[in-house]
């Protein structure tokens, strides 16, 4: 039987709003916009919201550099990072709260420094997770609590001790545990019932025995989606992922002079493929949780919130090609087919990498069987090339490549898309073509220097690409 408290809030709408690093610039120009959006959400919902915050732009990379310097015994100072928090506090925290906020910032700096002092030759594991979050998301969410209270909003920050995102102990790429996290819902529900909004650190998790973890790059998306999922039994949750620009048919900086279209709706599959191939809409683990719990996601541009995009299981859009993405920094690795199985298993199972794809095997004129893999992150290969040669000392890597991808679930029922795309780039050398419209993507591998030109040329044909196929009279395609 449901408890009274469960029934009381069962139909209340609760928004979980994530504000990423691009909105938390080091000068604080995005903070008034964030405050404005939180006010709008409160006015609309009457409850919450839960506001998930990333670290300020550039802070995570700066903290990684500082941590690695301590591993080399030439430790860089934390001052440049914490000066950002001091500056934001002076700009946006008022009265007595300013002194309290500055004391909290100093405490986070001391905790971060103590953690760095424990670095011994390697900046990794729990020490890395603790450093990045103490100096990043935990400090930022605390500061945003003070900023919001200074602007007349009742808020609270979730402490490390009560943190409701419980994870495994894969410290640098942790996976949330649904059942264990559900047991800590009071960290959300209690302040929400008291009429407060909740400031939550993104990217951060904690093991059942209290050790700090991080959720991997883009982990703040996962924090917001996961929080929405574990609260679905108590609230009608909405997940709002605030960005600086709307989701568009292509990057306007790449297709200069062309009109881009606002992408109003994407399926989970389309969003996953677009993000993996360079669009960075929502990170893959967050999409996986949303799909599992059928949780719609709204990607909201903070300056034009009416230009939001909805990501859900299915949508009624008639577009064949939703968007085009371009990604540089790719490579093709070629190795013995016989040795490729253990190589692939090692990367997928032990390294937990899914940013590469099998291009298939071919038989050379020598009779040797070679298998090729497309890697979307050539830096990983450069850093680990010697180690990877342990699988095949004769493996070869072609660097300097990029990928251009056409995204759309409806391509599987629309012949001719690939030929139109290829016809648009007759002057560009296609290194490889992965024509798999049944997977909602057509991938063209080109030289890195040609990525932008390829995207621009194909985008010019987008209207033509989205015309339904003109079948001959009386002809029906096979289903």
Language-model features: locations:
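Nucleotide/pyrophosphate-binding catalytic subdomain
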Residues: 2-282, 287, 445-447, 466, ...
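A generic structural signal for short, non-catalytic loop/turn and secondary-structure boundary residues
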Residues: 9-10, 192-193, 292, 326-328, ...
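Structural motif
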Residues: 13-15, 48-51, 154-156, 196-199, ...
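A broadly conserved detector of short glycine/acidic/proline-rich loop/turn motifs that flank catalytic sites
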Residues: 21, 161, 203-204, 245, ...
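A structural alpha-helix within SAM-dependent methyltransferase catalytic domains
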Residues: 35-39, 229, 291, 422, ...
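Glycine-centered loop/turn motif at secondary-structure junctions
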Residues: 45, 152, 195, 232-235, ...
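A conserved active-site cap/scaffold subdomain adjacent to cofactor or substrate pockets
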Residues: 268-344
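A conserved regulatory-domain signal marking ACT and ACT-like small-molecule sensing domains
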Residues: 309-479
